[in-house]
Amino acid sequence: MGIKGLSQVIADNAPSAIKVNEMKAFFGRTVAIDASMCLYQFLIAVRQDGSQLQSEDGETTSHLMGMLNRTVRMFENGVKPVYVFDGKPPDMKGGELEKRSERRAEAEKALTEAKEKGDVKEAEKFERRLVKVTKQQNDEAKRLLGLMGIPVVEAPCEAEAQCAHLVKAGKVFGTVTEDMDALTFGSTVLLRHFLAPVAKKIPIKEFNLSLALEEMKLSVEEFIDLCILLGCDYCGTIRGVGPKKAVELIRQHKNIETILENIDQNKYPPPEDWPYKRARELFLNPEVTKPEEVELTWKEADVEGVIQFLCGEKNFNEERIRNALAKLKTSRKSGTQGRIDSFFGNSTKVTCVTAATKRKAEEAEKAKKGAKKGGPPKKRAK
C-alpha cells in the first residue's frame, strides 16, 4: 500500500517538489529499483490478446521478458539500475498482510462471479488483483540479472527501506518504486512510473523529499508522523482524520502525542493500543544492510548463459534475445562515452517541468479555449 494519499498531499501542499520528466533526463544516474514492485508490474501487464507470456510448459515468463526489456531500455537512456529484493516482512506488517489475504479472498469470489456472468473485463480486473510474485519468479529474476551483469541487493527486510538508505548514502540517485513510503524511509528522491511501458507514454514523476519538507515546513519526524496519520502498512490510523485534517493537525501540534492530547477522541477515535511509536521507529531506523557494506558492480553480460536460460529453458526466441543483448552491450559502451561527453559540456540539454508548472499551463490553455468560444472562463469553485 505504501502511504495512503501521500502523492496527492505533496501535489496539493508542495507542488514544486514534483517534477515530470522523461527517462533520458536521468542520463548518467544510478537508480535503486524496488524489484518486487517491478516484477508485479510485469506480471499484471497482459498482451493484446489478454494473455500473459508463457513458456511451452505453460509457465508464466512475463516477468523475465519485462526485466530484460526494461533493463535494456534503462541502459539505452544512460541509466544504471540496481535491483533490490525484499527480505522478510517486519512483524508490524502482519496486520496489513492479513488484510491483503482477505482482499484476495474477496477478489477470488468476485472473479468467479464475473466468469459466470461472462464479463471478460471484470474477470481481467480481478485476475490482476490476484497476481502475486512467487519465490520462483523472484529467484528467476535474480538469476537473469546475474547473467546480465546487473547488481542485485537482497534486503534483510523492506526493499524500499534499503533503497532509501542507498540513496541517503549517495550510492544511487533515487528510488524507483510506486510505493510512496520510500520517502518516509528517507529516500531523498522517489521516481514513479519509471518502468511504465513506452506505448502508454506515462511521464516519470520525480518526488524530492527535501523540497517537500521545505515547502510544507515540516521536519523529518513531523513528516513521518503525517505519513502514519495518512495510513501506512504498519498500523491503523485515527478514524475520521483525512488527508487535509492530518496536515492541519501535524502543522498545529507537531507530533501524534500532542495531537492525541488535544483532539476530541470521541469524534476522532484512535485505534486501541495504537502502536504508532513502533511504526515511527521502524521508519526512522529500519532493518537494512549498511550502505558501505553493499558492493555495486556492473559486469559484462554472459550472453551464452542468458541464451541457455531464456531460450533453452524458457523457450524465448533466440534472435530476439540476442538482439536485446546486443543493444545492452552497445548502450553500455555509448553510455560510458556519453558520460565523458557530459563532463566536457557536450551533453544534450533535457528540459523538465514541475507538476505545478504543467498544471498552470493546462489551466491557461483551457482559459484560452474558453475565451475563443465567446465568454470568460468560469471560476473554479473553492
UniProtKB/Swiss-Prot annotation:
Mg(2+) 1 binds at D34, D86, E158, E160. It is found in: Nucleus, Nucleolus; Nucleus, Nucleoplasm; Mitochondrion. The gene is crn-1. It comes from Caenorhabditis elegans. This is Flap endonuclease 1. InterPro entries: 5-3_exonuclease_C_sf, Flap_endonuc, HhH2, PIN-like_dom_sf, XPG-I_dom, XPG/Rad2, XPG_CS, XPG_DNA_repair_N. Mg(2+) 2 binds at D179, D181, D233. Residues 336-344 are annotated as: Interaction with PCNA. One of its GO terms (biological process) is DNA repair. Binds 2 magnesium ions per subunit. They probably participate in the reaction catalyzed by the enzyme. May bind an additional third magnesium ion after substrate binding. PROSITE patterns: XPG_1, XPG_2. Phosphorylated. Phosphorylation upon DNA damage induces relocalization to the nuclear plasma. Its cofactor is Mg(2+). Structure-specific nuclease with 5'-flap endonuclease and 5'-3' exonuclease activities involved in DNA replication and repair. During DNA replication, cleaves the 5'-overhanging flap structure that is generated by displacement synthesis when DNA polymerase encounters the 5'-end of a downstream Okazaki fragment. It enters the flap from the 5'-end and then tracks to cleave the flap base, leaving a nick for ligation. Also involved in the long patch base excision repair (LP-BER) pathway, by cleaving within the apurinic/apyrimidinic (AP) site-terminated flap. Residues 369-382 have a biased composition (Basic residues).
